[in-house]
Amino acid sequence: KPVYKEKLRLRTYGQCAVDNSPAFLEIKKKFRGITYKRRFELTYKELHNYITDGTPPDKRGQVFEEIDYMIRRMSLKPKIVICYDREAYYGKDDKEFRLTFDGNVRFRRDDLDLRAGDHGEYLITQPYTIMEVKSAGAIPIWLARTLSEKKIFHGSFSKYGNIFANEIRQKYKVGV
């Protein structure tokens, strides 16, 4: 695995973005197993205008400038939309603890405007679900015991990485 990884994500929540929906530009960096995430909030209309014609939002800050520099330096353009149905749970006593379940993961490489809805080709369907556990420290002992009893063990899964790997397999007919 690489020591350093960096990705840019454009994100909205809900089934279909509208012009005044909250939207986020996020930089996610992973260095030696530690993930750092910085995000900038704007409306979907501002995000769409910025991505399509370079018009920056009225309100900017350090995080936006960092993202803007990254986009310009690397000539980044949106390439894929990934949608999923998420259930998220937060710790009652530990606000740093979060448990999420992502199901019905779908994607599309055309029609990249998020106002077009959450349609796409399925990557994962029921009964399969991605479970993610996030915690600033050790996970709660009750969860560790439950996962162990159910023989659920740590693994990694990248939605984008798996879409890309599937496309490569299809292209070269490897393992199909």
Predicted segments, located by residue:
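Phosphate-end processing signature that detects enzymes handling 5′-triphosphorylated RNA
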Residues: K1-V176
